[in-house]
Structures are given as C-alpha cells and as structure tokens.
Amino acid sequence: PLQYAAIRSSHPAFSWIVPGETGGTRQTAYRVIVADNHEDAASGRGNLWDSGVVGSDQSVAVRYAGEALKPGKSYFWRVKTVTNTEGESEWSEVKAFRTADRLSEYETAYYPQVKTMEFPAGITEIHPGTRLVDFGKDAFGQLVLTLASDGTRDSVIVHLGECLEGGRILRDPGKSTIRYHRYPLALLKGTHTYRIKIGKDKRNTGSAAVLMPAYVGEVVPFRYCEIEGYEAPLSPASVVRETVHYPFDETASSFRSSNELLNQIWDLCKYSVRATSFLGVYVDGDRERIPYEADALINQLCHYGVDREYAIARRSHEYLLQHPTWPTEWILQALSIAWYDYLYTGDSRSLESSYELLKPRVLMALREKNGLISTTTGLQTDDFLRSIRMKGQIRDIVDWPHTGILGLGKKQGGEDDGFAFTDYNAVTNAWHYEALKLMEGIAGALGKQDDATFYASESDAFKKRFIRSFFNARKGYFTDGLASDTDHASLHGNMFPLAFDLVPAGKKQNVVDFIQTRGMACSVYGSQFLMDALYEANDAEYALHMLTKTDDRSWYNMIRVGSTISLEAWDNKYKPNQDWNHAWGAAPANIIPRRLMGVEPLTPGFATARIKPQLASLEWAEATIPTIRGAIRMEVENKVDTYVPVSYTHLRAHETSAHL
C-alpha cells in the first residue's frame, strides 16, 4: 500500500521559511489559506480557511483555525508574507497534504521509513568462488542479489556482517552483539533476482521492542557481504543493499575545520543519526530495539544538529511518556526532551497535550523530609508509579554499565567513576533541579502562571538545598552523597551540577579543575553532559581535547576499530555486549553545532538565537546549521593577535546575539 506522511490532527499547524535575500529582512505580516481542492488554492481562495493578513513575525507553528479537517482527505495550502525590505511576496507554491484515517485534536505526524538503493564501494575476490562485498558503511537494510546459474550449482552461501577479522566477515563476535548472519540461497537455472529473507531475532522483537512495519519488512545492520560458492562474474549492479532509514537531507548540515580528526568524528556522528533512524523512532540500537529516554534525548539533539527534522524526536518522546524506562534520571529527562522540542520548533501543542504527564515526572512525590528526592526510602507508592506510567520500581543509574555486569568481570569497573550510591544521590537530585527549572518554563509557555511561579520558587530553594547537601566547601567540589553517607567524589557528581548551573558562585573553576583530573571517566552517554558542562564553563580548550583525543575512550577509537556508526560504548572491553550501531554515542553531532560553533535557540522556534563560537585552538571552522526557520551558515577564523569577526548568513525573521 502507498505510504505517506499523514496529518493526524484535525487542526494542524503550518510553518514556512521567510523569503528574501536582503540583509536584515524580517517578516511583518502573513496570510495563510487552506482549501479542499487544488483549483481554489491555486486561485488564492481558501474555501476552508483564510487567515487574512495577520500583522506578525510568526512563521512557525501557525495554527489552522478553520473547521475541523476530515479524515482520509487531501487538502491544499499556501502562504504569502510581507517583509520590511521586499514588501508583499507572491503566493508560495501550492502544497498538498493528506489526513490520516483517524484524527484527533492533536497527534504527531511523522514520515514513513524509506529505502535507499546502495551499491558496493568495492568487491574483492577472497579466493575462487568467494567474494567479499564492502558497502563502505554499516547500515540497516536488506540485500538483493542478481545471480546466474547454469543449473550445475544449486546454491550459494550469503554471509552478512558488520565487522571484519583477518579480511573475512567476523563470524563469532563473542559476547558482543556485533551482527553476523548466514543465509543459504538456492539458485534457479538462468539469471534471477533474489531478495534475502531476513529472519526475526527474538532478542529485538519482544513485547517491549518497536517492530519493523510490514511495508518494509525485517532488516539487519551490515556493511559487508560474502558470497560463497559463486564463480560467475559479479558486478556491483548485481549486489544491492536496500538501506532503510527515516527521510534525511544530507545537505541540511555541514562542518569542516582545521582539525581533520574532528572532521572525521563529525562525519561519523552525522551518519550515525541517519543510519540508526530505521525504526522511525529513536531506539537503543539493534540488540533490543527499545526506546529509552537517555538515547532519545541525545538522539534528539544530534538530529537537530544535522537535519531540519523534528517529528521523529517528538514521536519518540510521546511514545516514552506512555512507555517509560526504569532509570530515575531518565524519567526526569522527559522534561528536557519536551523543552528542547518546544525550543527548537516553537510548537507548544505537544507540551499542551502532555502537560499532566510531565508534571509527575519532576518526581516531587519522591521528596523526603530533608527536601531531597530518593528512590530508596519507601516513597514509590502505587499511585506514584501509576502517575509516571511505570509498572515497576525506578532505580538511580548515574551512568551505564555499572561494575561487574553485561560481560564485565565482577571487579571490572563500570562507567560511573566509582560513584557511591546512597539514599540521596547528587546526580539524581541535580536532574531533579533541572526538571524543576524546565517545568517552570513549560508552565510559563502554556500560560499556567501559578504553576510557573510555584516551580520557580521550588527551583530557587532547591538550588540552595542542593549546594548545602552535596558541596564540600573545604575541597571545592561536590561529593556523590550527603557528608554523613560518603566523602567520595566522582566525575558524574560534578559534571551534572556544572552543566545545570548548580555550582556555588566563585567555585566553578574548582569544579572544572576536579573534572579535569577524572578524564573521560564516563560512558558515551555521560560524555554528552561532560561536554555540555565544559562548554557551559567556557573551558573550550579542554573540551576540544576531549573531543579529539585518540586513546581507547574516544570517538576516534570508534573509527579506528572499524565502525562507521557510533558505538554503544568506547570499546568492546568497556561493554562486552555492546552494539556497533548506537546513536547515544554520537554526541559530537550536537556538541559541534551547539557548543563548539555555539548556535543555540534563545527563544522558542529560533525566534532569537545565540551564536557563541568556542573554537579553542582550532585555526578555523565553517558550518551549516539547520533550524526550523532556515540554515545558519558560519565561517570563523581564529588568528592570534588578529581580530577576525564571525562571518555568517542566517535565516530571515530572526535575531542573533553574537559573542566573540
């Protein structure tokens, strides 16, 4: 059946990029029309809705105000604008959209997955009758072969895998979940095209997993294909990988700098976003295919950094509100995902729809008498768990994996820097503070002023309480728990407070100094917040060092071991059961545009933006950074004793605050 991006709301919202090439162009008015037939729309008649000329600079999330749309119908819309430099525009092209078979007042629309035909980057004969096909990059897909047989050979063996060992596909990945599959293929006489039937894996098709849609079929991740027992000529056109992914615009973003290693890391992480989008929602990789909030948060920011695409993140977020996962901090991260969605799109409909689900995820119900939250003091009542849609207890995670699990030896350290878990956890409480701040912003955006005032008061009081509880004034940094419980200090117990503005006045450098003593003592997940913390503290040089270092706890190590998608962990030895296709390891895809190049929205929908490049020792950098209002293109030179201003062209109807 035909697949299309169905509009699922009876009152959708419209966005457009304001035309005009003159510097300083701003929209001053707009007019939107919606018709139920192409003829009316083409003639400038909105027989369902005509907004009239609206004096406004709003060009994102303009809500349809006509009669409710009907399910299963096609509609047509167009817009014209007035700007301060070019006056009234012509009508835009007529754009069509079709509604879903079932509509509600609000439901997120999304694109269907697509297939891209990809041909080999190279074919090598290993020995007579066996060829190794390399597609150049790992991807989730299906294999289509066109093979010939004279009838004397009735079958071949097809091997698919992600990794090579000794010039052959790795057949025994050990404890890891690096993928390998073997498929016998019976040949018919003559030349025929065969589609390899991918079988379901019990590990990633269970009740908690997101399943591939029937119109696509099952997929596996593979870069390499070996065809064994085939002696006829094999051309690149006869070996096709149909790669499955969410629609992706390769031209929407770019980055290059004077550091070639950093450029390679950007390429790895940008590609990882496309490659891991195969399910149409963000998941944790191929091993489980389950959405988790932490994966979704990092993936969301990375996707915003590499493509002008927002629906997949919103769909993933709304799925997780109904299907939350067990870590305490990840329940709290629902607030971050919701806020970033609003900040990057300017569309508050998801916030409105989800508001009552977001409030309990601040975890006020877990507040103890001392004002801190705890998951271990008996406060996880049935009512509380129902309020956050959880079927079991939640537990603090800090980072993952912990010591002695998932293939690690009993005494082999995990990724939490030896964090001392106690009843009152500095990391969990830092996330609680962040959630309070975000809930204040969400309530304010929705006009719920009493709630906004409440959360503002709570966050102000909680910041003081957090510092009193966890900051060791004598040492100048935070401990993992209360002084009565532990004096252990970890990277995590300090990087999260630094990232969330919880460090006491005048003590930021002390905390940064401590963080630098810990190195990359966190997982690829934790690295997102380490990088955020360092750039928040304006420690760009150390941040650049961490981005570009080359030991086995680095993004470069992912390239060195042979992966073309970001790994689940820094190396197999740090998580022996890891995937080689995990977008939560792709943090540079958002850290580079958001932090190094310094482009972030200050107000919802990029109505105002901050451009604050922190190049450190890079000689130069240039980037194209997507936003919902259009692309920001930047060129920055970094010369000693020479003032070289940022050169950038940016979207219209937009204000920018530049920092040098």
Locate predicted features:
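Well-ordered alpha-helical scaffold segments within catalytic/enzyme domains
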Residues: 298-307, 334-350, 431-448, 495-505, ...
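Short, solvent-exposed loop/turn segments at the edges of secondary structure
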Residues: 27, 140, 217-222, 294, ...
